[in-house]
C-alpha cells in the first residue's frame, strides 16, 4: 500500500476540498481537522497507518454535546462495535442504508 500513498496524494491534489462545517475526526490522528491540505494528507496516510478507533471514539464520547454516529459502509459493522463503549446511545447510531431508506435525520 506504500505505493498508493503518493498516488492518493496526487489524486487528492486535483480535488477542491472545503473546510468541514462539522467536526471530522481523522483515522490516523483521532483528532479533528479543518485544514483541507492536512485532511488530504491524512486521507493519503490512511492507506498505511493504523486506524485509531479507540482514541477516536473516546474523543467523540468526551465532547460536550451528544454525538450521532452514521456508519457509511457496504454493510453495518462498525456501529455494532460501539456497544463496547460506555456512554454510547444506540438511538444515535445508524447505518447509511437505514438512514436513506427511512429518510431519517439525526436531530
From Swiss-Prot:
Source organism superkingdom: Bacteria
Record GO terms (molecular function): transferase activity
SUPFAM superfamilies: FabD/lysophospholipase-like
InterPro entries noted in UniProt: Ac_transferase_dom_sf, Acyl_Trfase/lysoPLipase, Mal-CoA-ACP_Trans/PKS_FabD
Disulfide topology: none
Name this protein carries in UniProt: Putative uncharacterized protein YmdE
Species of origin: Escherichia coli (strain K12)
Lineage, highest ranks first: Bacteria, Pseudomonadati, Pseudomonadota, Gammaproteobacteria, Enterobacterales
